[in-house]
């Protein structure tokens, strides 16, 4: 039997049963990939996916093991003899075990992997202690904290590995080895040979790191960003006026890191935010905000994860909106009029090119287009007391799926990350700014918030009571009533109908006569 103590070092205990069942079929079985690497690094807590390699045929053995243990079986690649077995668990992520046929001898198989730290194997036999197999120097590179390619063709054979190098360096806190960097730079343009879906998935993992802005900067340093996210690369060296102290690219890096801090706080990965005042302002709604940002816009892509992407896209329109003028005092002032609309177009087009879902593209576009709205509201209500009518209009205009939609919250948190980025140069008014944002959040979660089904009157009632024919006037009146209801100016059906009548009189509108 496989030692439970061994399993506890690097994986969920249920995997012990899988290994024992496989060893009853044939031996040895090799544990390969990230689980071995993470075990040697002591980063193994909570491993829920395991990669195994064994001699062919794998598919029938995997099916028998799955049937015996009650796991689900999926043939992933019949030609290459690769299968997956999955154990669903209540209140915990599923356990996933991928089983692949060895590509030749074990040494040949390991030599085909991407980086030395991933080319490690643990040989498992029934009557022998586990044995670490390291033919590529992976253990030494783990100790040196380096990401090094296995061989001279590792990157050319699969260009998406260049993105993986950045991801693993950020994930593990390693540096990319000099020789590997020298291989990446002349091959950087080949990264687009990988499918859009594979590029997207690697970029998603990079942006899911604790400091995704640093990952973006590393992609740029290596020459990869211009090929996978050219609009972001184009923001480098685009100057800005105070309160900004960085160019647009440097600012974007900072906003992404602040957005990641908010993401990690909302998802429970951390219990504190860098700014204590910000944390205090958001704390009353943390649970509700967490529920909102847990919503998946597509499989595996939550609103929380998208916060960093919104930060990435929000100022990509600035190069196309750059202008410089001389003010009365003779000082040069840089402006970016309308950059949010350009950013919105870029966000939609790039998200679509990366094969994000239609819903994700829609949300990315509206958030980029709206990211200046909270700043403008703060300027209009400098004391932080944003009116209920303004709150209603903001949430209405940023909704992407009817009145129940709260995409405006995504805009607000992006604005908070954006407002933090200038640091001390942001000037005064931070407390008032937080009060204003908190007021909109409070309005969004208020029990009496205007939503589908709780308006004072509907179109049928309006047309019947005021003798109106269907048309744009009815829509205008309903929206006007909803605004007034949100502002607390009308609280009953009678008051709503009276308001509608007054609006009709002001407009000089004469109702249509039936049959006329």
Give the residues covered by each predicted segment.
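Catalytic cores of the polymerase beta-like nucleotidyltransferase superfamily
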Residues: 1-516
């Amino acid at each position: 039997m496989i030692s439970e103590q061994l399993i506890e070092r690097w994986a969920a205990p249920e995997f012990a049963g899988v290994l024992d069942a496989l060893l009853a079929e044939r031996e040895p079985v090799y544990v390969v990939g990230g689980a071995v690497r993470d075990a040697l690094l002591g980063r193994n807590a909570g491993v829920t996916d395991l990669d195994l390699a064994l001699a062919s045929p794998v598919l029938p053995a995997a099916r028998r093991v799955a049937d015996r243990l009650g796991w689900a079986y999926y043939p992933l690649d019949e030609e290459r003899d690769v299968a997956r077995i999955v154990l669903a668990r209540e209140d915990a992520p599923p356990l996933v075990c991928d089983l692949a046929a060895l590509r030749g001898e074990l040494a040949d198989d390991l030599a085909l992997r991407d980086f030395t730290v991933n080319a490690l194997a643990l040989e498992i036999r029934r009557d022998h202690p586990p044995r670490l197999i390291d033919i590529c120097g992976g253990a030494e590179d783990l100790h040196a904290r380096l990401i090094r390619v296995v061989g001279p063709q590792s990157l050319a054979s699969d260009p998406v590995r260049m993105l993986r190098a950045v991801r693993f360096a950020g994930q593990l806190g390693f540096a990319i080895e000099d020789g590997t960097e020298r291989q990446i730079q002349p091959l950087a343009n080949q990264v687009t040979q990988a499918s859009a879906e594979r590029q997207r998935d690697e970029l998603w993992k990079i942006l899911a790191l604790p400091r995704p802005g640093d990952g973006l900067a590393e992609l740029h340093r290596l020459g990869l960003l211009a090929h996978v996210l050219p609009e972001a690369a184009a923001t480098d060296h685009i100057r800005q006026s105070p309160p900004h102290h960085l160019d647009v690219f440097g600012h974007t890096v900072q906003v992404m890191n602040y957005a990641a801090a908010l993401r990690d706080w909302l998802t429970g990965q951390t219990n504190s935010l860098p700014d204590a005042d910000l944390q205090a302002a958001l704390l009353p709604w943390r649970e509700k905000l967490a529920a909102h940002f847990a919503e998946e816009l597509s499989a595996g892509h939550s609103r929380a994860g998208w916060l960093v992407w919104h930060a990435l896209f929000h100022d990509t329109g600035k190069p196309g909106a750059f202008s410089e003028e001389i003010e009365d005092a003779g000082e040069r002032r840089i402006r970016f009029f309308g950059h949010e609309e350009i950013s919105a177009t870029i966000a939609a087009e790039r998200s679509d090119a990366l094969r994000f879902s239609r819903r994700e593209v829609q949300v990315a576009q509206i958030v980029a287009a709206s990211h200046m709205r909270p700043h403008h509201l703060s300027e209009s209500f400098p004391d932080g007391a944003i009116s209920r009518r303004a709150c209603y209009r903001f949430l209405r205009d940023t909704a992407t799926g009817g009145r129940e939609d709260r995409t405006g919250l995504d805009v607000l948190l992006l604005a908070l990350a954006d407002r933090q980025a200038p640091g001390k140069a942001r000037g005064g008014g931070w407390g008032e700014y937080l009060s204003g944002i908190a007021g909109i959040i409070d309005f969004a979660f208020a029990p009496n918030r205007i939503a589908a089904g709780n308006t004072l009157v509907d179109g049928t009632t309006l047309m019947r009571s005021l003798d109106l024919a269907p048309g744009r006037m009815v829509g205008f009146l309903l929206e006007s009533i909803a605004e007034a209801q949100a502002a607390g100016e009308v609280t009953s059906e009678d008051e709503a109908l009276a308001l509608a009548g007054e609006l009709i009189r002001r407009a000089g509108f004469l109702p249509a006569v039936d049959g006329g």
